[in-house]
Design a protein with these regions (language model features):
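Extended beta-strand-rich architecture
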Residues: 13-17, 59, 90-213
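Gram-negative/organellar outer-membrane beta-barrel architecture
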Residues: 1-113, 177-181, 185-195, 200
Length: 213
């Protein structure tokens, strides 16, 4: 069992997790139980969030990790000029893989993550949605010192009531791992009062060149 806290001016968070390994292959197959509380005050987002989740993980020799998830969350939030409370119960699937060579400053590597999450009022959620996400980072080095970092993220939310999608599930861009030169999560559509609303669709990409002295 583990417990972690994160404290900063825009976010305070408490997370707990418990892993139950399976006897057949305890390092590669296990259940993960999680719970958390979070308070956010960032840009035009204010939110209090409670979460619970149970996940079943599989890993294989190729490095791909697969998971089936069932998540519950309760959000009371203000996004821009809209204040609401949303309760969600939603299953999902995800696959991801991370590879690297070169220690703390990898000279070669990649990270890939793909996920689908589904919510429906049929089983008690406040809204229906389907959320698709793909996140990729590639690192390659030429002639020992010339390091290139490629990033690409795509997200899509299909829903019958976007205003009730919690801010954590909406898409915001900006920051050094998204669009450099913009504040963290400061790029999204804005409402008539020039407040950030978050987006239902997102596509970002970047290429960085780094020279290692």
């Amino acid at each position: 069992m583990s417990c972690s806290t994160y404290l900063s001016q825009p976010k305070q968070q408490l997370d707990m997790s418990y892993i139950v390994p399976l006897l057949k292959s305890p390092l590669e197959q296990y259940y993960l139980f999680q719970g958390g509380l979070k308070r956010t005050d960032l840009n035009d987002t204010k939110a209090d969030t409670s979460t619970l989740a149970v996940s079943r993980y599989w890993e294989n020799s190729s490095g791909w990790q697969k998971a089936l998830n069932l998540r519950w969350r309760l959000d009371h939030y203000t996004q821009g000029t809209v204040t609401d409370t949303t309760m969600l119960l939603y299953p999902g699937v995800s696959v991801n893989r991370t590879r690297s060579r070169g220690g703390m400053m990898p000279t070669w590597g990649d990270s890939q993550r793909y996920s689908v999450d589904v919510s429906d009022t049929t089983w008690g959620s406040d809204i229906d949605f389907v959320i698709l996400q793909a996140q990729n980072v590639w690192i390659r080095t030429l002639a020992e010192r010339h390091r290139f970092v490629f990033r690409g993220n795509v997200g899509w939310i299909e829903t019958n009531d976007f205003d009730r999608v919690p801010p954590d599930l909406r898409f915001f861009a900006g920051g050094d791992r998204s669009i450099r030169g913009y504040k963290y999560k400061d790029v999204s559509p804005r409402d008539s009062d020039d407040k950030l609303t978050g987006a239902s669709k997102m596509a970002t990409g970047s290429v960085e060149y780094q020279y290692n002295f």
